[in-house]
Amino acid sequence: RQEKVSLIVKEVVKDLRPSLELKISTDEEEAFTDADFIMAQMRVGGLKMRVKDEQISLKHGCIGQETCGAGGMAYGMRTIGPMVHLIDVCEKYASKTYWIVNYSNPAAIVAKATQTLRPNARILNICDMPVEVEARMAEILDTDLSNLEVDYFGLNHYGWFTKVQCNGEDVTEKLKKHV
């Protein structure tokens, strides 16, 4: 799988940032030595386990989605160990000012676990869900996304928009009524 993905990444880097040095390796020391930024998007267990997580959860009347409920918890438990290992490898080999940019789900569970188990880790846990919701709000309000200013608290599917303004006007209640 790594070889297939690396072919695509090589083309993207060549087109967008030809001066960027791209290393592809399965050797931890070679891959992480002096790295400044490490991008992580883990799917521990692959899509087969995602299907199982969701089906087992639904069978028992629970939410099966990969970030919330029983399905998300199972996925999170599988992901914590490899993420902690990645942090340890980065601590050992990467530059002293490294940053891990983690895009792995379930973001909230993985973020809390890494914060607890490796409190000094240099890791940013991110998700595009809030951005997608914000884009939908702009559609509902028939405005450009650049006209919105939002207050958001949380991470991924465990977050809340506490205030939404459109061109300076508070439209939070208007959006609530739409929902």
Protein language model features and the residues they cover:
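Conserved N-terminal Rossmann-fold NAD(P) cofactor-binding segment
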Residues: R1-D34, Q41, K48-R50
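Flexible loop/turn segments at secondary-structure boundaries
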Residues: Q2, F32, L47, A107-A111, ...
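Short, surface-exposed basic-aromatic patches at helix termini and helix-loop junctions that form
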Residues: K10-K14, K92, K112-I123, A138-L145
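Conserved acidic residues
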Residues: A35-D36, Y98
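Rossmann-fold NAD(P)-binding glycine/threonine-rich loop
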Residues: V44, K48-R118
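Substrate/ligand-engaging "lid" and interaction regions
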Residues: R122, I126-V179
